[in-house]
């Protein structure tokens, strides 16, 4: 009986919130240009355009405004309980990020689902959509996120099979299938299955926001990224008023090293996100833009973007995008410029997501080791070990592995600083090999510095230029067109006496940073080398 009262209370609070949100929303500009979506329902004809706008927002992960818009629909037509599907889909959060619904979000979603079951949608198809999303929330508290993701994927696969002519069912099936992709699976099997569904849909619906969006995610891997350029260059024009739609193309631009495109689209995304008070999205876009500018040698612009982002708080969103970007941007600014003393002085900030704290301790430790302060590096290494232990205890395997990659790299540079070159290379190589087996998370444009690139720099310091060049060039396969990689490759080739290859890499460095600040020592060296030939 108590459970029934609780469910009723939650449901009632949802309906009240829906009504309030609808009244508040009456004076808002509801979304703008978001792409074309067709999702027939049995709801009142007057709310159908608003419902489809909410679905378009859902496809572009504009969750806060989509939630308000679905609430607006339900307030205008209380019989339109298929909105429970949309509401519950929003509360699962980004299905590619792996974080899933919060406990509070799961309770709200279940209340909406229960309300839809008490007042069922008028058609079987709509009821099936509600039950498909309900599969994720079933026994929510007693299942790990991976089990929920798999249940969701199977439910939407069944929905798509039952309604083969329902293109929205096919598109959501592809999304949730892509959401089962493991970072450890470098066959990218789930992505390949999603692509097989989405590419025909893209030909059929070139202005559909979800199709372009999910294609980008499904091509977001080193060997696949080139195939994602068509969708990447299309998506921002499909839904230019959605902050995430403006950011998403840069997932592909980063993978292929197209930095100018990444800067442009992320600046637009950050501006639109701040206008919409979507702070996690604004920080996320800013981190990608900072990363891209640093590759172009635009250190001043990177710093300005970071400082602009820091003028705004991250809000109370459970998304890790804010704390990750807040920790990553200053670490990138120091590490990409080789400012080891600056890196060592970065200030750690406590976070509910401990892996974001690890970014700062990693940068501090590398900076301290490379500027000769071994004692400080060892203290920060202890913090990394402690964070790694916490993540393992929480069974957060992916991020525990990422922190272990950082810990091994730090141990390698500490060994290097102590004069134990062989041990340093051994540890740094272990870090690079582990990183290669663990695909980067979508929250980041890239690790603070690629581990294999760090290995190349260590070998170069040890006067092993041939070995260093081998590692730099291997790193380019996964992280192309990076400033520090070209600089390291050029210096390694120069030290080997390979003048032709050195000149080629120095020329790439100069071309890459032709619109940069021009004050990095690596660039001065490159210009001098080219001038003397």
Question: Could you describe each region identified by the protein language model?
Answer:
Residues 45-53, 79-94, 121-141, 165-183, ...:
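Amphipathic alpha-helical repeat scaffolds of TPR domains
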Residues 57, 91, 135, 177, ...:
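Residue at a conserved register position within TPR or TPR-like alpha-solenoid repeats
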Residues 75-76, 160-162, 202-204, 233-241, ...:
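Solenoid-like repeat scaffolds
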Residues 81, 88, 92, 103-118, ...:
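TPR/TPR-like (Sel1-like) alpha-helical repeat modules
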